[in-house]
From Swiss-Prot:
Belongs to the ARR-like family. PROSITE patterns: CCT, RESPONSE_REGULATORY. It comes from Oryza sativa subsp. indica. This is Two-component response regulator-like PRR37. Residues 697-708 have a biased composition (Basic residues). The keyword Hydrolase does not apply.
């Protein structure tokens, strides 16, 4: 009997709710014995009377109001709920569900509603329930297939205890009784959650309407439907406690008009509710202060200094003068300014403002010195990023109490008015320039006169220098003969190499109004005027001697291979590790008036795979090609990896700023020669391969012919070769038989 009673218990018994009945009296003889299966009493077996707990435990099942407009979903969820021992009251829409809720005889324990429904939506139904004095104690669980964060937050902020995402699992429905138990436990006053107020959550401004139901009339849930911070009256079970949501018990909202004290922010130790923090980007950035307070003025001054230093560190805006209060009831939680309780004197205010201004100036000076050091290290940088600096507010501003100061880190150094040269240079640095990574860099590269280490220095020597060079006894002079400043004119790391006594005079190129673009001479007349410049490899050239020595060694090795009378030029270095084609701007400022400009420039050629040397115009693959045009200059290209010389002779073509006969696409004479050489190599390789294949096939053919001849000589009998002797004997025997027949 007792076993049968235990067997009939269901999930409701686990809640302390009995659903099965048991007999009050045990049948049998004497009222105390058991009976056998046939009905006869069993004597001699006496047991004490049993206690049926079902008589004392109230029988109750949890009633769930299921609201869903979809018939199939409603039927499936209803079946699952009934299988979990819940009593289900289905409703097709929100209006019908509200009718069931208004009828107090239904005694609904839990509401499970869909968010998106025609007519009265789930959020509207939730708002009505939360505004009702009696129905607001009923837990409301929202369910939807849309799990957008805005929709979930809006439902939970309006008072829903949970949000289920479809498809709903059976285990989730089994645990719905916990919400009812938690609500009853909190409203009875026996738990630690009693007396906790629910948080008023303002309407979100982040466009949550896009995540809401599109086919529902959700206009009536915007005004007067949000739970407030007012304490509930004592009409709820006589306990005078506030109904608690399972998730927003301590939903701290920074932009809330009512600020909470630290003791209100603390959760109970046994709280099972989550914490939701709602931030607003336009207000929360002004309130990044911890909840601490100081009652001593000295400590307050030290705290002000500390927070000013922290302001300089993180760059967060703060108002050190007035505490921002949206309502008179709001408590100021800023430790830097407790004006209502501890007003500051005017002297302390001025001192604080002066300290802030001094700190700002010191920070600006520190940043300026750092920027100066970086500029000194990167003096060869071609372009500078624009400085996005903001103004530092002054302490003597009249409208300072109404403006939130924004103390941001600036890369622009605060300079004096007397430093005109630095001011002009700083303004020019702030000008937006095109980067070296631009698509137009390969065609036009501006050379700035005020930037150190960025200009190209081309050596141009008159034709009369050859006779002067023959009189010089120094074979290799590694020192530069020009008196130009190495840093300003970009000649740092460059060398002037004189081969076989030839003296080269450096002409410092500066940007002028009338510039001549010197193009490379054409090596092959049939190809027209094409550029023979090699792609220059540019890298950062720090002001040290090691890079200069290495460059001098490379140039010296290249000069040793050159022929006498050639015009050498300076090695070019550029601070950007970028490979692109460059046109050199050479002015006729320092050149001879009657002497022609040679316009020769040495650039580094990146290594070319598959070639042992540079093939020149004259067909010589020795690495250097010598020209014979006396009046015309020669363009020399120095390879950094293998110091071979490549000279293309021709005429110097002069064009205006808008013209130019160089293609700039890498299809110059050198590229043509390289491609031609590659083509020759490929043709030779193909011919050699075909010859080898022909020889190999010829050998195979010979072997095949010999085997064929042997096969004809040695006939097969049943697929096997037969010896020649056996074959001859057979032939002789056959001849004898024929003769006998005759």
């Amino acid at each position: 009997m007792m076993g049968t009673a235990h067997h009939n218990q269901t999930a409701g018994s686990a809640l302390g709710v009995g659903v099965g009945d048991a007999n009050d009296a045990v049948p049998g003889a004497g009222g105390g014995g058991y009976s056998d299966p046939d009905g006869g009493p069993i004597s001699g077996v006496q047991r004490p009377p049993q206690v049926c707990w079902e008589r004392f435990i109230q029988k109750k099942t949890i009633k769930v109001l299921l609201v869903d407009s979809d018939d199939s979903t409603r039927q499936v969820v209803s079946a699952l709920l009934r299988h979990c021992m819940y009593e289900v009251i289905p409703a097709e829409n929100g209006q019908q569900a509200w009718t069931y809720l208004e009828d107090m005889q239904n005694s609904i324990d839990l509401v499970l509603t869909e968010v998106v429904m025609p007519g009265v939506s789930g959020i509207s139904l939730l708002s009505r329930i939360m505004n009702h004095n009696i129905c607001k104690n009923i837990p409301v669980i929202m369910m939807s297939s849309n799990d957008a964060m805005g929709t979930v937050f809006k439902c939970l902020s309006k008072g829903a205890v949970d949000f289920l995402v479809k498809p709903i699992r059976k285990n989730e429905l089994k645990n719905l009784w916990q919400h009812v138990w938690r609500r009853c436990h909190s409203s009875s006053g026996s738990g630690s959650e009693s007396g906790i107020q629910t948080q008023k959550c303002a309407k979100s401004k982040s466009g949550d309407e896009s995540n809401n139901n599109s086919g529902s009339n959700d206009d009536d849930d915007d005004d007067g439907v949000i739970m407030g911070l007012n304490a509930r009256d004592g009409s709820d079970n006589g306990s005078g406690t506030q109904a608690q949501s399972s998730w927003t018990k301590r939903a701290v909202e920074i932009d809330s008009p009512q600020a909470m004290s630290p003791d209100q922010l603390a959760d109970p130790p046994d709280s099972t509710c989550a914490q939701v923090i709602h931030l607003k980007s336009d207000i929360c950035s002004n309130r990044w202060l911890p909840c601490t307070s100081n009652k001593n003025s000295k400590k307050q001054k030290e705290t002000n200094d500390d927070f000013k230093g922290k302001d300089l560190e993180i760059g967060s805006p703060r108002n050190l003068n007035t505490a921002y209060q949206s309502s008179p009831n709001e408590r100021s939680i800023k430790p830097t300014d407790r004006r209502n309780e501890y007003p500051l004197q005017n002297n302390s205010k001025e001192a604080a403002m002066e300290n802030l201004e001094e700190s700002s100036v010191r920070a600006a000076d520190l940043i300026g010195s750092m920027a100066k050091n970086m500029d000194a290290q990167q003096a060869a940088r071609a372009t500078n990023a624009p400085n996005c600096s903001s103004k530092v507010p002054e302490g003597k501003d009249k409208n300072r109490d109404n403006i939130m100061p924004s103390l941001e880190l600036s890369l622009k150094r605060s300079r004096s008015t007397g430093d005109d040269a630095n001011a002009i240079q700083e303004e020019q640095r702030n000008v937006l320039r095109r980067s070296d990574l631009s698509a137009f860099t390969r065609y036009h590269t501006p050379v700035a006169s005020n930037q150190g280490g960025t200009g190209f220095v081309g050596s141009c020597s008159p034709h009369d220098n050859i006779s002067e060079a023959m009189k010089t006894d120094s074979a290799y002079n590694m020192k530069s003969n020009s008196d130009a400043a190495p840093i300003k004119q970009g000649s740092n790391g460059s060398s002037n190499n004189n081969d076989m006594g030839s003296t080269t005079k450096n002409v410092v190129t500066k940007p002028s109004t009338n510039k001549e673009r010197v193009m490379s001479p054409s090596a092959v007349k049939a190809n027209g005027h094409t550029s023979a410049f090699h792609p220059a490899q540019h890298w950062t050239s720090p002001a040290n001697t090691t890079g200069k020595e290495k460059t001098d060694e490379v140039a010296n090795n290249a000069a040793k291979r050159a022929q006498p009378g050639e015009v050498q030029s300076n090695l070019v270095q550029h601070p950007r590790p970028i490979l692109h084609y460059v046109h050199f701007d050479v002015s006729r400022e320092n050149g001879g008036s009657g002497a022609p400009q040679c316009g020769s420039s040495n650039v580094f050629d990146p290594p070319v795979e598959g070639h042992a040397a540079n093939y020149g115009v004259n067909g010589s693959n020795s690495g250097s090609n010598n020209g014979s045009n006396g009046q015309n200059g020669s363009t020399t290209a120095v390879n950094a990896e293998r110091p071979n010389m490549e000279i293309a002779n021709g005429t110097i073509n002069k064009s205006g700023p808008g013209g130019g006969n160089g293609s700039g696409s890498g299809s110059g004479n050198d590229m043509y020669l390289k491609r031609f050489t590659q083509r020759e190599h490929r043709v030779a390789a193909v011919i050699k391969f075909r010859q080898k294949r022909k020889e190999r096939n010829f050998g195979k053919k010979v072997r095949y012919q010999s085997r064929k001849r042997l096969a004809e000589q040695r006939p097969r009998v049943r697929g096997q070769f037969v010896r020649q002797a056996v074959q001859d004997q057979q032939q002789q025997g056959g001849g004898r038989e024929a003769a006998a027949d005759r």
